[in-house]
């Protein structure tokens, strides 16, 4: 950030720069950015290809000061990997008390009581010394489990106040559920980075359920692949994925599924205030021309038949050509065809069949189930910037002691007191004030709480 500041202060010879959202607001406050409203309004593609939410982010006093870069896809990155073969064995042995497997019909969900029942059975199947559910180091709030208790994001508006997750209604019930699992010996918690990781625990049958990111699927699924198998196309039918848990009252109801998703604007193209009008006009025109549909597609994913194929309207990479020629292409764009990019980017999640399996499962119907964190769209905020990191760390450390340590019972009041002592009320009030003045608050999350 200091280097960027210096580049602007010294009026170095550049016409535009890609900066982080936080740096954008710092430069905007310093008066270092050129307004580009008239050029955006006169563009052929640019204005219409970026959402109202995006333009709102970079607008101040009616002037546009940057071209926002949205994350390619509204999606969840994490899901629960589970031993599908063990669940099948349980159901065959218990025809009168079966557990519904995650499927398209139920939105790849499972209700909380069935999940616990599955863990109880898995505890009889793990290797000696293992536990049914493996939870990674530092993880206290499992985003696949929290929605079952009404906690849909790290920050959510409730009755006019934007609340941190531990302050939201439902968190106490979540914590009691998790402590119950731990106290009954169903959970392995990776206490330090030197302890066995949960992916390794799953691979060695020391755990039957773990949280996994979609980029970890290849490691999970290919460990038992037959010799000579094409690993890029291999998936293991013994492994399945859960997108989220639902309340028992919503068992089997795909419309009740809610997942933590994300799609913020993490970077912004900006122009220095010392640009001439001709320079600014030329830069925006250049960005606009790159959004011509055919040129944009070729810039992002290459040429059909050479770097990608299209199957049923979906884009799939041709390897290794896609990696060799287009590996970093999505990092070099300035301005997006947002809707098109959300389809093209999926080719990057399909580099292996295993990754495609995990990603597509946990993001099944995500446009109707995913809830995003509004704070991802917030401008600079003194209370949040100054206090939140410490408050978040202190609360998380306390949750580790309470959730994964039988010696200390969960105490919501104690968690709340830590939050307050770390200026949590100031953070909450400041975020709420911003949120209530945010022009896009009513359209940012199209999916609502259950």
Feature annotation, model-predicted:
Residues 1-53, 59, 89-97, 155, ...:
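Extracytoplasmic "Venus flytrap"/periplasmic binding protein-like
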Residues 13, 25-29, 35, 123-132, ...:
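Secretory-pathway/luminal and periplasmic proteins that interact with or process carbohydrate-rich
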């Amino acid at each position: 950030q200091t280097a960027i500041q210096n580049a602007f202060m010294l009026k170095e010879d550049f016409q535009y720069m890609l900066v982080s959202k936080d740096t954008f607001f710092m430069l905007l406050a310093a008066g270092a950015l050129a307004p580009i409203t008239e050029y955006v309004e006169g563009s052929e593609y640019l204005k219409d290809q970026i959402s109202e939410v995006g333009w709102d982010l970079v607008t101040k006093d009616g002037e546009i000061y940057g071209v926002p870069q949205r994350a390619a896809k509204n999606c969840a990155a994490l899901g629960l990997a589970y031993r599908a073969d063990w669940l099948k064995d349980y159901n065959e042995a218990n025809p009168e008390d079966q557990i519904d497997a995650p499927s398209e019909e139920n939105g790849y969900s499972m209700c909380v009581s069935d999940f616990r029942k599955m863990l109880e059975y898995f505890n009889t199947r793990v290797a000696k010394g293992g536990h049914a559910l493996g939870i990674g180091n530092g993880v206290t709030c499992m985003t696949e489990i929290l929605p079952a208790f009404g906690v849909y994001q790290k920050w959510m508006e409730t009755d006019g106040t934007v609340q941190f997750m531990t302050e939201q209604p439902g968190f106490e019930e979540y914590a009691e559920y998790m402590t119950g699992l731990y106290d009954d010996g169903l959970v392995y918690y990776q206490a330090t980075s030197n302890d066995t990781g949960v992916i390794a625990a799953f691979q060695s049958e020391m755990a039957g359920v773990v949280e996994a990111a979609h980029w970890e699927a290849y490691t999970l699924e290919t460990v038992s692949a037959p010799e000579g198998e094409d690993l890029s196309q291999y998936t293991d039918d013994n492994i399945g994925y859960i997108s989220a848990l639902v309340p028992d009252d919503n068992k089997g109801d795909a419309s009740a599924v809610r997942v933590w998703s994300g799609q913020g604007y993490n970077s912004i193209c900006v122009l220095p205030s010392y640009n001439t009008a001709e320079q600014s006009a030329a830069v925006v025109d250049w960005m606009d021309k790159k959004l011509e549909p055919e040129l944009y597609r070729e810039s992002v994913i290459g040429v059909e038949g050479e770097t990608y194929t299209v199957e049923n309207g979906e884009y799939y990479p041709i390897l290794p050509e896609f990696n060799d020629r287009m590996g970093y292409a999505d990092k070099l764009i300035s301005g997006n065809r947002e809707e098109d990019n959300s389809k093209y980017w999926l080719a990057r999640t399909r580099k292996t069949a295993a990754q495609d399996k995990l990603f597509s499962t946990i993001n099944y119907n995500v446009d109707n189930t995913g809830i995003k964190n509004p704070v991802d769209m917030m401008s600079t905020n003194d209370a949040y910037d100054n206090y939140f990191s410490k408050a978040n760390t202190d609360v998380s450390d306390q949750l580790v002691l309470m959730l994964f340590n039988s010696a200390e019972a969960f105490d919501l009041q104690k968690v709340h007191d830590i939050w307050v002592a770390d200026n949590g009320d100031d953070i909450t009030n400041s975020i709420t004030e911003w949120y209530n003045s945010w022009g896009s608050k009513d359209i940012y999350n199209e999916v609502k709480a259950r």
